Every structure is written in structure tokens, then in C-alpha cells.
Amino acid sequence: MRPDQPLEHVALLANGLRFHAVAAGPADGPLVLLLHGFPELGRSWRHQLPALAAAGYRAVAPDLRGYGETGLTGPYDVATLTDDVAGLVRALGRERATLVGHDWGGAVAWAVAARRPELVERLVAVNCPPATALFEAMRRSRSQLRKSWYILFFQLPWLPERRMAADGAAVVARALVGGSYRRGVWPQDELDAYRAAFARPGRAKAAIGWYRAAFRQALRPRRRGRARRVSAPTLILWGARDRFLDRALVEPSVLRRALAEGNVPKVVFVEDAGHFLQNEAPERVNDELVRWLGRA
């Protein structure tokens, strides 16, 4: 299969919402659920879907809540997003899945692995640290706070979504191109598809709503008690030239706080790639994914 081959488009009902997803691979293959980030869509995994399908996996990449062709209905808090993934696994007729998440999709994957371990066969996080690490880093690291300026901007009412949707969501294309270390990785037709998706009524506000919900959650006092740690085998793929996230977010000391005792992750840094790793270095990502999953 080639990345430019047509993929299946499927509709799934999960957690009371209709989800659109792109899919590839044998219906009875081991399930790999690929969760996109911001400002992306399920199609951001267009290079990985054929590679996973060719290796015998059933690969499914949904537009997440509020994105693309999926329903707009909130809320966008982590508990709801976790339930969405659980519902998607059930809607696909499975009990467990490997979760592969990039950026926000990675944050959801980390949360599902911690909160619903029975659902997660394996976890792959692509340029996304453990769930609480980013806001902790924003508190203690000026470098990360500067890189995360947009998260603070997104807390303003109405202005961020208006700017995001303006001029046919031109800022989305600029974010994808500008956030990539490698040049020429976004064909014009892909950029046009993203712009069209985020220019639709309500879509920019929904995507920014994820940040608002997470920020409100981060401001709440933490409940006392033992933190839930991830026991699923974990692979971390990281484009080292990320403009938005410091590589310190996946230092061993950070990962030890998020992972169960004895769960030693494999961490792979791709030195000549940036935040949008699966699009900047698709062959490297595909190779790492297929080889690591094949060790199961």
C-alpha cells in the first residue's frame, strides 16, 4: 500500500458521539488506534496507516472530539476524552488496542494507559510527555513557558478561535509548516484540507476548547492519593528539533514518575526532525513502530 492510496472512511458511535475515522488493514488484525494532535486530523497518520496495514495490523485514525468530521459536542476534559477512546475500542469490536498518540493525542493516550490500563496493549507517544509533565514544566521552566505561550493565549475568550478561523484558517497551515523542522513535508493539498477543516463553524473553538479544559484542570488543587502509573510497554518517539516541547520533558526522572516500577520505556530521538515527527520522518517512524510492535 502507498500513502497516496485511498483509505477506508468509517463512522463509529462512541461515548454518545459520532466519530469519523480513516482506517486500513485486515479487519481481524491487531488493533492500533492512532490519535492525532493539534492542529491536526486523523489524516495526519496518512503515512503510518498503510505501513501498519502492510504489517498485518488493523490501523484506525479517528478525527477526535470536535475535529474534522467528528461531532462537535463537548466537554473536552480528559475524563471525556478517555471515555471516547474506550468507546472507540468497543465500537471496533475489541477489548484492547495499542495506542499511538501525537501531541494532544499522546496526552490522551497517556491518560487512557494510566486510567484504563485494561484497554491498552501497548503505548506509543510521539512528541508528547506524560500527562501532567507539561504543566509542571511550565511552572518551573522559563524555556518551556516561553514555548507554551500559545496555551496561555488560548485562555482568552473568543479571540483565539476568531484568529484561528480567519482567512480560511490560514494560521493552521502556517503552524504546520512553521512547526516542522524539515521543509517540504506538507503538500499543498494537505494544507488546503486542514484549512478547510478548521475554517468550518465551531471547529477552531472546539480544538482550542481542549486547551481551556486542560488549563482549568491544571489549576485545580490535586487530590491526595497515589498517582496512577502506566504499566503498558511504552515507546516514545521524539523529534528533537521540537519548537514547542523541550526534550527534558522525557528525561528519565520525568518518565519514572509516570511509569510503573519495572516499566522501562524505549525512547528514540530523531535529531533532524521537529514536532510533527510522523509527517517529517515517516519512514523512520514507520520502521520504529513496526519493529517495536513486532516484538510483542
Could you tell me what each predicted segment is?
Residues L35, V270-A273:
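Short hydrophobic "strand-cap" motifs at the C-terminus of beta-strands
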Residues A273-P282, N286:
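Catalytic histidine-centered segment of alpha/beta-hydrolase-like enzymes
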